[in-house]
Amino acid sequence: MQFLWPYCVILAMNRYVILICATVLSLLPTSLNAQTFTLQGRVTDEKMSPIELATVSVLSQGKVTLTSLKGEFSLTLHSADSVVVKFSMIGYKTKTRVLRNPRGKQTLQVVLHEGDNTLGEVSITEMRRQTGQTQELKKDANKLAPTASGNAVEELIQAQAGVSTHNELSSQYNVRGGAFDENSVYINNVEVYRPFLVRSGQQEGLSVINPDLVEKIGFSTGGYAAKYGDKMSSALDITYKRPTQFEGSLSFSLLGGSAYVALGSKTFSWSNAVRYKTTKYLLGSLETKGEYSPNFLDYQTYLSYIPNKRWQIDFIGNISNNQFNFTPADRETKFGTMQSVRSFKVYFDGQEKDLFRTYFGSLSIKRNFGDATSLALVASAFQTKEKETYDLQGQYWLTQTETSENLGVGTYFQHARNFLQARVTSLKLVYAHKSKQHEVESGVTLKREHIEERSHEYEMRDSSGYSIPHTGTDLHLIYSLRARNQLDANRIEAYAQDTYRFGGKNENTRYTLNYGIRMSHWGFNKETIVSPRVSLGIVPAFNTNLTLRFAAGLYYQAPFFKELRDTSTVNNETSVTLNKKIKSQRSLHLIAGMDYRFNVSGRPFKLTGELYYKALGNLVPYSVNNVKVVYYGDNLSNGHAAGIDLKLYGEFVPGTDSWISLSLMNTRMTLNGKSLPLPTDQRYSVNMFFTDYFPGTDRWKMSLKLAFADGLPFSAPHRQLESHSFRAPAYKRADIGMSYRLLNNERREKTSPFKNIWLGVDCLNLFGINNVNSYFWITDVTNQQYAVPNYLTGRLINVRALFEF
């Protein structure tokens, strides 16, 4: 084999020579090797929005680059017969372009389409940290819970710490001693209104918030930011969802039903929702028997169009028709103590017909100037037509049950012809800018308000043949009111606020500071109010599970139609005028709170506590009967509200959310030199919401709601507040519901068109407690008065079904 050795040496030398030559040639100027060209262009998505950090690669030449923030790229490449260029980005389909014998400068416009393949589902559960005064509530917490009113969002609010209600038929609520009218409600940054003439939960019907459309719920019981309007108790901020695919649901129960359907894509979404509610079955448990005909119908639509990253157009429309007809027959109520039971029997003639028809719409056009800055123009309109008419006659007997002694016999006649029309239009401009540490927002709103009312109501009573009040000479009605008023006014509102986040580096303490100011001017009373507000959230470095919160601010209750109605009474005949000298009610909020997050057996919990003090000034006193609030029409008193709210929230049962809250409160006001509690003085309240599953399966789900709250002060009607010497019994109620998941198709593994099917049965007022809503007062000829309680609904069974697709 030795003769082959010279040939191997020669071959090896030739290989080295070839390698050296190739290396030298590669170092020569490119003009000696091959021509080059420049490839440039832009990568966008289907909406022509730039895709940043997309990969542009030519693997044959080992060249790779990334697109800029504007989606642009540039590469210098070698010319060849064909050059293969790949464009790729996570979440998009990879695109390949082949360039044939490219020369000079080549420009490409590349559109990447969304990819079909998605990552596997990953669930990350963590309690949201609250560093401001607005807490975010889970929208699905009440989805399968038992309900009497059908207003799921408001019932969720009523179960929070610091919030109370004494009427399961109503969606209204009191917050830390405030009246029903002191709570602002926003839907997609537009303030919404309630009907004006509603006087009972039976009439109320459906609220403006449709739970099927809700994406996010923000709620604050005090110390809220400057962007929320001139109300001095609470702010409820609702955001409607933008579905990106087809979805819908159907629900039915003995109390009504709802339907929801939505179409969606990346650029366009359209949601439609219809609700129908009838409380005929529920009202049948009241002691007043008769023919109830409540029919409440509501339709809402939400359209959202995002043609590109720069523009967004939203429209919300709502039509609501709440109709309540009632022909009473008779009533029998037994009340008193074990030792002294009294019976109140009434036979009725007449009927009641009420109609509340509202329209609401908003149009928003938003322009984004990059990812950090936006400007939005929002136009909205609200209109309501309301009618409350009744002629009711009752012949009553009040007897002592043990002795059959007649305590009072008589007749009463109630008449009302109340009509109201209102229209509120507004135009709002909102500017927002975000940076690394700041979130700046400001806005200006112009409003036009027009309200007309025509009211005539009276009540006549006689006892044993004598008309009350009995003077012996003159004939008077016990109550009579006439009103014919019109309000036309302009209102301008402006605010500016900043959320500043700082600290947090190298395990330092983190701070969230929100500060702002709000201004409002009302043309009716020529008043200008200025409201500074500030809140601070602290996450200390020594314990990141702890959050401390402090807030202070001057809040005003800008007067609206109800507060303006100043009454004067002569010989039991009341006339109503609008008081142009009325001023805004004032409340100084001082709040200190904390959140502490911890785990028990691997399950997350959060303990929240808040101390608050509200100094109240320029108060307009009012009385409450059922849900009707009647104001004095003038600034006559000052007062305060102070208390503590505690809430424990967490997974009492793995995989479920439950909570229990405790509120203690003291309120006082000074009226005509006398100190007395506010009409909504609720000294204590306990709310609990608990969910559970059957052991070994998640098909069966139980929901339990408990409420225990102190009774409110009250006195005889048409009396001054100084006579509030009584307090109603405590409000106690338990509702329980059991749901069975007939179909679980969340992952779409089955061919069924439905995603979920739930069947449920509820027991409303589980313990059958007779809660007092208000009182009917009987007066005999000697002016002796008897308070007959008007009880709320009794125990009822409700069945329901929910289909989601």
Language-model regions, residue ranges each:
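Short, acidic, small-residue-rich periplasmic hinge/interaction motif at the N-terminus
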Residues: 42-46, 54-59, 86-93, 102-146, ...
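Short acidic/polar hinge/loop motifs at secondary-structure boundaries
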Residues: 74-76, 191-219
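Transmembrane beta-barrel wall of Gram-negative outer-membrane proteins
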Residues: 249, 253-276, 289-329, 352-381
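Surface-exposed extracellular loop regions of Gram-negative outer-membrane beta-barrel proteins
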Residues: 281, 329-330, 334, 541-590, ...
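Membrane-embedded beta-barrel scaffold of Gram-negative outer-membrane proteins
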Residues: 374-380, 581-635, 640, 759-764, ...
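C-terminal beta-signal and adjacent terminal beta-strands/loops
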Residues: 655-658, 707-715, 740-805
